[in-house]
Design a protein with these regions (language model features):
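Intracellular loop-helix junctions on the cytosolic face of multi-pass helical membrane proteins
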Residues: 1-21, 113-116, 132, 146-331, ...
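Helix-loop boundary and gating motifs at the non-cytosolic
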Residues: 9-69, 323-328, 332-357
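Loop-to-transmembrane helix entry/capping segments in MFS-fold secondary transporters
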Residues: 56-57, 146-156, 366, 449-461
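Helix-to-loop junctions at the C-terminal end of transmembrane segments
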Residues: 72-88, 382-396, 480
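C-terminal ends and interior cores of transmembrane alpha-helices
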Residues: 95-114, 405-418
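Hydrophobic core of transmembrane alpha-helices in multi-pass small-molecule transporters
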Residues: 105-109, 113-132, 422-436
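Intracellular juxtamembrane helix-capping segments at the cytosolic ends
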Residues: 131-144, 436-450
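C-terminal transmembrane helical hairpin of 12-TM major facilitator-type secondary transporters
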Residues: 397-440
């Protein structure tokens, strides 16, 4: 591949060439399309589900598609994309396949005739987005020398913000241009449909731009780069034999986790508990069985190199900083998932005074939520330009805790602003939190991890993004049903009460930051 200069040689090490700005833009532009897909999903799926007959209590369960597919697809795609090579290279085949599937899912989603079709399409959409997105993070490491990687990730952040803003305002803009935001019962409004159509086309073209303008290094080229370039073919990426837990560790914890999951599920059954709790119980049982299966693999060969043993082994031997940061990330994403599920019904109730998903007022609220998310993403994108400099002055740990508290204040602000324009103000705090969550935890983590384990630990760190979403999806509905008549009326209704749960979760995350040890603040 031709960079802005050819490879340079220092001693026995051949270094990657630096790329020029236009090449970095080309390799990052696909993220613009990917974020259009995510933003259309986050801003409109609750609205689509409710239009097709879903009630408030089932929304978290229906939203489980995202975290579950992320938990499954991200490690699989990352693992196999490392081993792929073909005419399009290593990562680009996944960009292409994912973009095609995502575009088809975006075209189908607003035309779903039944709730079960929309729910199934969401599973396909989320899986496809993960196939497309996951290799993009590794793409920066593949293509750029070490000193250009911050620029590469910053460029991705810019395109994340730009794509999210445009997709978020699309339904509002189409309605302003005369495309109706009202439809018959059970039919998705035309302004939402056209947002998905245009968004799907934009996603496909953006990803194709990266696929066809960026040529990857061949395996023999990558093998020439030294360790300082994080040689992806280096065979030292797994955990050391001395660190790998013995078979008895996995069998003991496998039995404990499986038994706890089974006991939890049995308690739900015999107490006639809400069926959504079975999601949590079933997930624990599945994790326990994975531990037991891995116990057999490790017993036969403790040094065996396989996907499951490497992931579970490194999961149990995470560095101390990563363990503490995982707690912060967990509660941060609990709050974010609550925001995505409940913002539309909360805004409809607070500013438009309606809970009727088929009403014109509710559709107006749904359009306005797109504007709110656009403000949030715009603030996050702008904040990303200066957040590194601020962190150097006040300390990364203190800044991230402050940003999370700003996000918590944003959640609380939903209760203090009753007009649609007033509700834009809380999105400033939530935008600061969102920009911080996208950047600072990864900066802290990168400083704490050995380079040879960076990839697998980053993948494991993503578990603490999807696991809280599964927890919210499996428990939030039953919790809100329990509080619907007793507590929720005191706070303006179920969705506004749920928003306060998001504020509390951000506060817990900010408190947990005090236990994270960070060099240079």
């Amino acid at each position: 591949m031709a960079g802005s200069g050819g490879p340079t040689q220092t001693g026995d090490t051949i270094r990657k060439p630096e790329l020029n700005l236009f090449q970095i833009i080309n390799m990052s532009f696909g993220f613009f399309g990917i974020q259009i897909g995510f933003a259309l999903q986050n801003g409109n799926v609750s609205r689509i589900f409710q239009t097709l007959g879903a009630d408030m209590s089932t929304l978290p369960l229906l939203w489980l598609a995202g975290p579950i597919t992320g938990l499954i697809m991200q490690p699989i795609v990352g693992y196999f994309s490392d081993k792929t090579w073909g005419p399009l290279g290593r990562r680009r085949p996944y960009f292409l396949i994912g973009a095609i599937l995502t575009t088809l899912a975006l075209f189908i989603m607003p035309n779903s005739p039944y709730l079960w079709v929309a729910a199934g399409t969401l599973w396909i959409l989320d899986a496809s987005l993960n196939i497309t997105m996951e290799p993009f993070r590794a793409f920066v490491g593949d293509m750029l020398p070490s000193k250009q990687r911050p620029l590469g990730y910053s460029m991705q952040t810019i395109f994340i913000g730009a794509g999210a803003v445009l997709a978020s305002i699309a339904p509002f803009v189409f309605n302003a241009l005369g495309v109706s935001n009202e439809a018959a019962d059970g039919i998705i409004p035309d302004n939402v449909k056209w947002s998905f159509y245009i968004g799907g086309a934009a996603l496909f073209m953006a990803v194709m731009w990266t696929v066809f303008t960026t040529k990857e290094y061949a395996p023999e080229e990558l093998e020439q780069f030294g360790k300082d370039e994080d040689n992806i073919f280096e065979q030292e990426g797994g955990i050391d034999a001395a660190e790998r837990p013995e078979s008895s560790f996995f069998s003991k914890w496998g039995l404990i986790i499986t038994a706890f999951g089974a006991a939890f599920s049995a308690a739900v059954y015999y107490s006639n508990g809400d069926q959504q709790f079975y999601v949590l119980g079933g997930g624990l049982i599945f994790l326990g069985l994975l531990y037991l299966f891995n116990s057999g693999l490790v017993k036969s060969d403790r040094n065996a190199r396989n996907f499951l043993s490497d992931v579970l082994g490194d999961l149990t031997t995470m560095p101390s900083v990563m363990k503490r940061l995982a707690v912060v990330q967990f509660f941060s994403w609990v709050g974010l998932f609550i925001m995505w599920i409940y913002t539309t019904p909360a805004v409809a109730l607070q500013a438009w005074g309606t809970a009727d998903a088929t009403s014109g007022a509710y559709q107006d609220a749904g359009d306005w939520v797109g504007i709110m998310f656009a403000v949030q993403n715009g603030v996050a994108a702008l904040y990303a330009f200066g957040i590194a400099g601020i962190a150097r002055k006040v300390g990364t740990r203190s800044l991230h805790a402050f940003n999370l508290l700003a996000g918590a204040a944003g959640f609380v602000g939903y209760h203090f602003f009753a007009s649609q324009y007033g509700l834009l103000i809380p999105m400033i705090g939530l935008g600061m939190a969102w920009g911080s969550i996208l950047a600072l935890p990864y900066a802290i983590l990168a400083d704490a991890l050995p380079v040879r384990k960076m990839g697998i630990y980053m993948g494991i760190f993503n578990f603490f993004i999807v696991l809280p979403q599964i927890l919210v999806g499996g428990t939030m509905g039953p919790i809100m049903r329990t509080l619907e008549t007793s507590v929720a009326p005191m706070f303006g209704g179920v969705p506004l009460l749920a928003i306060l749960f998001g504020a509390a979760s951000f506060c817990v995350a900010a408190f947990a930051m005090s236990f994270v040890k960070v060099e240079r603040g």
